[in-house]
Amino acid sequence: MIRRLQQYQNEGRLSSTTLFCTFDITDLYTMLPQEESLDVLIEFLLQHGYQKVKGIPIDAIRTLANIVIKENVFAYEKKFYRQIVGGAMGSAFTLTLANIFMWKWEQRLVQRLLPSNEIYGRSGLLEIHRKHISKLFSSLFGFVFRYIDDIFLTWNGSIDSLHQMLNEANGHHTNIKLVRQIGQTVPFLDVLVENQHGLVLTKVYHKSAAEPYIAPFPSD
């Protein structure tokens, strides 16, 4: 992401007034719509040319995925419950399914909101590609970068128009809600990104909530 942002600066597209915005999805793993996520999984496999994965037909994959995502049970106060929304936290399959679900979600969002011929970067599945879509925000967007459910973008319009776009994105899916941070200095994952008079500055970012649980570097 840093290299792409530096390239964006070198192309003269970062101005002194360019805003940075980061947002993430609230409780993505536990808010995945189960049936829709399974539909997206099959769509993803078909779109990438898979009829089988390691010899397993995609119909069988859906059946197995259905068991994994829908047969999560847990006990609370001497009662048993079955999870009907989302998947198990910490499950490798939930992570994969969430990433694929976001692949579809972002496609829909991009088609509605992003400009023509702009860079659209995805780190979650290690893919960089171009989209030819609505020119509504062609002078406003620089690029968007996503890692699973954490998204970074640049914005060259007003802060009000950015809030308007994000509010629209928040209404795009009932289960997907965005928490945003906007400014010329914003954290993204483990990087603090700053726009200092049209120059990109970065440094390591430590989440304050995580500090008490991180072992110091020189510790044994």
Residue ranges and their predicted role:
Residues 1-220:
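Charged structural interfaces that engage phosphate-rich ligands
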